[in-house]
Curated annotation (Swiss-Prot):
Species this protein is from: Trifolium spumosum
GO cellular component term of the entry, any: chloroplast
GO molecular function per UniProt: RNA binding
Function: Usually encoded in the trnK tRNA gene intron. Probably assists in splicing its own and other chloroplast group II introns.
Organism domain of life: Eukaryota
Pfam families: Intron_maturas2 (PF01348), MatK_N (PF01824)
HAMAP family noted in UniProt: MatK
Keyword Lipoprotein among UniProt keywords: no
Protein known as: Maturase K
Keywords: Chloroplast, mRNA processing, Plastid, RNA-binding, tRNA processing
Length: 506
């Protein structure tokens, strides 16, 4: 982001902190191209890198300079000359430019707040999503109730733009942003359809993720305000994420908003043992206290979304359950708190007592049905879990086919290695193994049995089941008892920051 700072300082010297002129600068789109070129190989870019050229950028900027081309026809936006014949391509370029420009001031604010707090090093530790699981193991065993909440979606994009205007004071920039969103999403109705939102998010991932994350950050900042008001304990771990939007400077305004929007005064309560975890569009609220207090938090969330963000949320979509009797889905796992009962014999003098001890343990299970559904969607098996061949990969070499299957199996094995029960994982690996064999047999136009007998590939395909043991043998001594003990325990790969589509099935 150093080049971001340089370009923003250059723009500040010309225009007084306005973002609007940056949209017409070629280097902004060069930064967007660099971001697309350097991102993960697992993410498809939809041909953006192949079609990008400086000539196309100059042509797009020229079109935007011609103000008569910015007039939108509400009846038929597809004929708008602003986009010409390459509407999808130009919209993708300009959305990347919008994302780069709007991220600059927020990144600079976040960097300054992190430097002042001297927590740059600790901030890097929160990159891994797998840090959630050790947190669950440490905290959730002491809690009793959990509420599985899905954040309301979709939200009207006009509300997102209005929320963003609170923090960036540049009216021309937001007029152009609103014009772009209006033209692409076709805002002829009050609420855009899920199909239009989905299309917008897939072709413009960076801008969509920024707007959506900003909406989530705004709602979580208000939730943090309620949480701090309801308890004497401050959430130190949350302060890093909310200082970037200057939340504490907005506290007095929030009090006025709540007093106007809510029909009654919010009766705050003391609940120091509440924990909040969010990933993607879901969040989990867990507490040690009685369900009455959890119901209060449930209504706070509903009224917050309805009054502050104009998003309708049904009370029945938020369920409150006991952790010992309910499994909640998070990060591709099914998790619950299992009660382990044991009886201890105690003797005092000549009297003998039987004492029943109940201990809690976080039970994390591999969800077999969602994984089979994902494998069926990727054409590795049918909906019943029966392996099928992958004819699309038949043009590759035998080594490449086996390596592709092994890579998927390796990712799944690493991701779900922390589960307490691995039988479901072994079944998934078995499906991938047979699918690989059938793909190779299909390529060589043979049956599975004849192919294995002729090529002797059975030993090679044993890597699907022996690879994890070989990895552990590099870390721990090659001792059968040691490996067996570690296979029974959980090993979290905390350096994994990317999960493929097969494990991201929520």
């Amino acid at each position: 982001m150093k080049e971001y700072r340089v370009y923003l300082e250059r723009a500040r010297s010309r225009q007084q902190d306005f973002l609007y002129p940056l949209i017409f600068r070629e280097y902004i789109y060069g930064l967007a191209y660099s971001h697309n070129f350097n991102r993960s190989i697992f993410v498809e870019n939809g041909g953006y890198d192949n079609k990008y050229s400086l000539l196309n950028v100059k042509r797009l900027i020229t079109r935007m300079y011609q103000q008569n081309h910015l007039i939108i026809s509400a009846n038929d936006s597809n004929k708008n000359p602003f986009w010409g014949y390459n509407k999808n391509f130009y919209s993708q370029i300009i959305s990347e430019g919008f994302a780069i420009v709007v991220e600059i001031p927020f990144f600079l604010q976040l960097s300054s707040s992190l430097e002042e707090a001297e927590i740059i090093k600790s901030y890097k530790n929160v990159r891994s999503i797998h840090s959630i699981f050790p947190f669950l193991e440490d905290k959730f065993t002491y809690l009793n109730y959990v509420s599985d909440i899905r954040i309301p979606y979709p939200i009207h994009l006009e509300i997102l733009v209005q929320i963003l205007r609170y923090w960036v004071k540049d009216v021309p920039f937001f007029h152009l942003l609103r014009l772009f969103l209006y033209d692409f999403c076709n805002w002829n109705c009050f609420i855009p359809s899920k199909k239009s939102i989905s299309t917008f998010s897939k072709s413009n991932p960076r801008l969509f993720l920024f707007l959506y994350n900003f909406y989530v950050c705004e709602y979580e900042s208000i939730f943090l305000f309620l949480r701090n008001k309801s308890s004497h304990l401050r959430l130190k771990s949350f302060s890093v994420f909310f200082e970037r939007i200057f939340f504490y400077a907005k506290r007095e305004h929030l009090v006025e908003v709540f007093s106007k929007d809510f029909s009654y005064t919010l009766p705050f309560f003391k609940d120091p043992n509440i924990h909040y975890v969010r990933y993607q569009g879901k969040c989990i609220l867990a507490s040690k206290n009685v369900p009455f207090l959890m119901n209060k938090w449930k209504h706070y969330f509903i009224y917050l979304w309805q009054c502050f963000f104009d998003v309708w949320s049904q009370p029945r979509t938020i369920n409150i359950n006991q952790l010992s009797e309910h499994s909640f889905q998070l990060l591709g796992y099914f998790s619950n708190v299992r009660l382990n009962r044991s009886v201890v014999r105690s003797q005092m003098l000549q009297n003998t007592f039987l004492i029943e001890i109940v201990s809690k343990k976080l039970d994390i299970i591999v969800p077999i049905i969602p994984l089979i559904r994902s494998l069926a969607k990727a054409k590795f098996c049918n909906v019943l879990g029966h392996p099928i061949s992958k004819p699309v990969w038949a043009d590759s070499s035998d080594f490449d086919i086996i390596e592709r299957f092994l890579r998927i199996c390796r990712n799944l094995s690493h991701y779900y290695n922390g589960s307490s029960k691995k039988k479901s994982l072994y079944r998934i690996k078995y499906i991938l193994r047979l699918s690989c064999i059938k793909t190779l047999a299909c390529k060589h136009k043979s049956t599975v049995r004849a192919f294995l007998k002729r090529s002797g590939s059975e030993e090679l395909l044993e890597e699907f089941f022996t690879e994890e043991e070989e990895i552990l043998s590099l870390i721990f001594p090659r001792d059968s008892f040691t490996l067996h003990r570690f296979h029974r325990n959980r090993i979290w790969y905390l350096d994994i920051i990317f999960s493929n589509d097969l494990v991201n099935d929520e």
